[in-house]
């Protein structure tokens, strides 16, 4: 077979080696570099809570902040600061997470397809620039996807594995509330492979246990049972405004622009999210062509990271 003639596993290993070395070079170049945009905010919120001896979000932040952002990741950073007292080593943590994610994705593609496809996948993963540069910033993306794909990789007809899978995917949702998009494909997968109904119980027990623990934790630190981010509206409005350029721009939040909210302290984060969402949808309805036109630009910027 073709993949045997070209020693596909060996080629995949070579690409992994180059990929790991490239990440180490990036870490060296950007070691302790200042963070920007979301990464800067994550560090700011985590450091603030760490210095005040609390967890995120605090009760007052539901009123003072424009949104509540990915508490699962920020609380990880707070715990990390309790150990290292500096953000310098976050890229090393990211390198470990990225390696774990690649292993999980290799396992998933091997299980769904075959070893040859899994090796091709590894090669494609390693040449994607964003999968190299992602180790540098302090962002939630890699943390979220590692939990998510490790959860999916654990899905098999073993009660303990399914319990762990449920725990991981529930925490992944605490990091970024997007796991609902993956639950339906997971359901079809286990349905296709005719899992016994008892395995469903193990999986949903894991989800239920972790969700309950997170709700109790959140109630203890700020008196609310909300465990998801309120970023849907603000994320949408960043890509749905007259100054759209395919990436983040703060022009949208300047006075007179669609993202500007008069007297923001009068609204809590849920109300602000609703305002951003309704304005975004209204703009998209009025400018569907412009919104669609920038999709390729967004994809290109995402690839380049």
Regions found by a protein language model. Name each.
Residues 1-25, 199-206:
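Start-transfer (signal-anchor) and selected internal transmembrane alpha helices
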Residues 110-115, 149-164, 172, 190-195:
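Membrane-interface transmembrane helices that cradle and orient dolichyl/undecaprenyl
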Residues 162-176, 186-187, 206-209, 214:
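Membrane-interface alpha helices of multi-pass inner-membrane proteins
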Residues 87-89, 102-127, 145-146, 160-164:
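Transmembrane-helix signature of polytopic, membrane-embedded enzymes
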Residues 51-55, 64, 68, 72-96, ...:
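Juxtamembrane segments of multi-pass membrane glycosylation machinery
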Residues 37, 68, 90-97, 120-150, ...:
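Multi-pass, polyprenyl lipid-linked donor-dependent membrane glycosyltransferases
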Residues 221-305:
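Membrane-proximal stem/loop segments at transmembrane-domain junctions that anchor or position
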């Amino acid at each position: 077979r073709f993949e045997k003639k070209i020693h596909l596993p060996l080629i995949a290993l070579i690409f992994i080696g180059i990929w790991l070395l490239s990440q180490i070079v990036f870490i060296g170049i950007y070691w302790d570099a200042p963070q920007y945009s979301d990464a800067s905010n994550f560090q700011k919120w985590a450091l603030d809570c760490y210095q005040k001896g609390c967890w995120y979000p605090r009760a007052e932040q539901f009123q003072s902040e424009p949104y509540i952002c990915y508490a699962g990741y920020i609380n990880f950073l707070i715990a990390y600061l309790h150990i290292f007292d500096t953000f310098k080593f976050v890229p090393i943590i990211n390198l470990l997470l990225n390696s774990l994610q690649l292993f999980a994705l290799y396992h998933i593609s091997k299980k769904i397809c075959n070893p040859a496809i899994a090796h091709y996948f590894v090669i494609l993963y390693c040449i994607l620039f964003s999968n190299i540069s992602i180790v540098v910033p302090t962002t939630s993306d890699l943390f979220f996807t590692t939990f998510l794909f490790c959860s999916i990789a654990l899905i098999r007809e073993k009660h303990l594995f399914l319990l762990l899978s449920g725990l991981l995917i529930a925490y992944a949702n605490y990091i970024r509330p997007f796991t609902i998009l993956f639950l339906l494909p997971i359901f079809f997968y286990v349905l296709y492979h005719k899992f016994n109904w008892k395995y469903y119980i193990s999986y949903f027990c894991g989800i239920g246990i972790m969700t309950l623990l997170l709700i109790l934790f959140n109630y203890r630190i700020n008196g609310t049972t909300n465990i998801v981010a309120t970023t849907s509206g603000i994320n949408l409005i960043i890509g749905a405004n007259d100054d759209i350029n395919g990436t983040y721009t703060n022009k949208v939040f300047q006075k007179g622009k669609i993202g500007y909210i008069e007297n923001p302290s009068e609204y809590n984060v849920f109300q602000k999210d609703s305002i951003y969402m309704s304005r975004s949808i209204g703009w998209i309805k009025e400018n569907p062509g412009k919104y669609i036109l920038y999709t390729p630009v967004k994809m290109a910027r995402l690839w380049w990271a």
